[in-house]
Amino acid sequence: NKEDECALSSAENYFYSHYTQTKLLGETLKEKILDPDIEVVSFDIFDTLVFRPFTKPHDLFTLLAERTSTAFNLGDKNNVKQLRIDAERIARDRLYVNNKSYDDITLDEIYDVFNEISNLDSSIVQWIKNDEIQLELKYCYTRQYAKELFDLARYTGKKVIINSDMYLPKNVIIQILNNCGYSEYDDLFL
């Protein structure tokens, strides 16, 4: 019917348009990297070099909550997800009140708050924190077009800088980068 044809046409146009825009952006970025006047190329980590197969970042917490509920027979798995979201928000609020110039919170600070606001034993909270790290390591994948740009920058002798404002510990971020094939860079700023 006509309505289905319009919907299909609209979806096809969206993906064609999105693909075309991404391709054009990639070509523009390649030209910039090849520019001899450009000496340094900087890449953000999450959602640029690396992606996670979740619609929203908090979707990882849904999986974390399900695994926690199963491991400890907690029942209400949504409570763990909400506690994790609340702990991050509270940690950020506290940090901002105490030190407005500080960049960002750490995973340890998030889980210190999580421990305060939950009724869970601290050993369970530690397990949840470790599981979150394992899930991040498991579900971070290489973004292929960004890897091509990264490799081009390395190949052309540019100084390559990687940066992120992520709360994960530096050693975990380095492991994610290594797992995704990003081991040769000049500087890492967190």
Would you name each region that the model predicts?
Residues L49-F51, T142, L168-N171:
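Flexible loop/turn segments at secondary-structure boundaries
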